[in-house]
Every structure is written in structure tokens, then in C-alpha cells.
């Protein structure tokens, strides 16, 4: 049997149309299954229909309009799909063994759930709608510019290799590791509850937060970008450059470098910092109920310890500016 497929389309009559890669086909009257090397190009899925792609089947340039699903699994590939479902009802669903490449979400949903084996999403862009990365999701070069990403549902590991957060909110948790992320103006990256982000940067005005159980290691913030360590969250090995900031709201900061024009502020009780290098024209603030230790303050760098704050094992180089308010405490190394 040829891999050219004929679809039945009916609305009061019957019409046959070859899916030949040249003409778009509307999937209104029935679902379609692509497998065993079958290929479909330019289909439009709507009205509750479904396009199933598996076992070496391939769907290219599918548009999912209105209420419709594109389901990819077990060796199937979907590429260059556009999901723009009415009232957020269109969906791209990538299951175990499935791969979706260069797909765009205008509205609707993307779910990637690979249990019991990997499901793969590559070079996808989400402008809106909810996105979920669940068990065994394997994602690379993902961009979110609107809507919400939740990466962490299910007990299996989730891996994201490269992400741009240009808007919207990305939540990383539940045994999910994010390697390499850039958070831009209007974007928020939250890491919590077993999630980890490695080398997440906020070069402009993005926001990166470590919440309870979340770890952020490596990365940098400049411009108006900033990090926040909430209670139970940890920032490790970050670098702050001019205009960049980090805030301790009950969480911890370790191994950080505070560069010229940058600020590290321990503001809420319970915040702590360890192994901090404050470079020329950088600032470290230690407020009431907060503590810092193993601090190196360079020439023309600034350490301010307020009433109720504590700084231990401080190395103050010649020309450093160290200010301890009444009720503050400092010990030099």
C-alpha cells in the first residue's frame, strides 16, 4: 500500500483528497493515524479531531485550530506544527518515544510526558497557554514568551537543555534539571522542591528565584536582572555584575562574586551568605537577623552590617569600606 493517504471529509457529502504534501487537508470528520513511514504535510486539525503519529510516522506543518490534538509517541515525529487552539483547547501531546521539533504554541497546551521512556521536544516556542514537562521529558532549546511552564510533575527525571524565558513564568521542580537558561525582561524563572538550575543568567531585567528545596548553581545577573533566595532556597556560585542584584529573603547564598555596581542584600531574617567576594564598587548588605561569613572585601568595595546583622571571618583589604551600625556584629579573619 502506498504511503499516500486518502482522507474522508464530509459535511453533508463525501470528498476524497490525497495527502500529498501539496494541499492542506482539514481533519474535521475523523481522526487520522500516521505510522510505518506514512507522512502528512499541511494538515489542519480542528473540531475535536486527533492526529496520531507513531512508529516512524511523520507529521509536518500541522496546524491545530479550535479543539484538536496532535499526539506523538513511540517513534513518531511531528515537526513545524502550530498550535493555536480556540479557547486554549488545541494541544500538542508528546508521549514516550515521540519527538516534536520546531513547533510553535500560540495558544492551547503542550504536554511532554515520556513515562516509561523519554519523550523529546526540540526547538519549541510557546507564546501562551500552559506547558507541562512531566516524567522523562527530554527538552532542548525551549523558548517561552508568555503563559506558564510547569516542569516537575511525576516522579521520573526531567531534563531541559537550554531555555530562553522572554516572558511568562517557568517553574522548575520535582527532579527536574535545567542546564543553561537566559531570563530576559518580563520573564520569571522559579526553582523549587527538588528542582535545579545550572548556569541560569539574567542579563537584562529578568528574575530568577530559588524557593524551598530549589538550588541554583552558577549563572550571572547584570543590568536590572536579579536573583532571589527565599526560605529553603540556595544560590550557589553566582556572579553579579553592574546593575545586577541578589536578595536573601530567608534563603542562602554561597560562593558568590559581587562585582562593580552590583549588590547582594540579605534582607529577611534567616538569610545567610558564605564565601562571598565583594569586588571594587560592589556592595554587601547584612540586615537584622541575617548572617554572613568568609567575606573578602576588596579595596573600594562596601560591606554594611546593620543592627542585628552578623558578619564573621571578614577579610578587609586596604581601602575597603566597612560600616557596622550600632547593634551590628563583625569579626575579622
PLM region spans:
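The right-handed parallel beta-helix/beta-solenoid scaffold, focusing on the short coil/turn
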Residues: 3-7, 13-16, 23-32, 36-43, ...
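Short, intrinsically disordered, charge-balanced linker/junction segments flanking boundaries
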Residues: 329-333
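Residues that line or immediately flank small-molecule/substrate-binding pockets and catalytic motifs
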Residues: 85
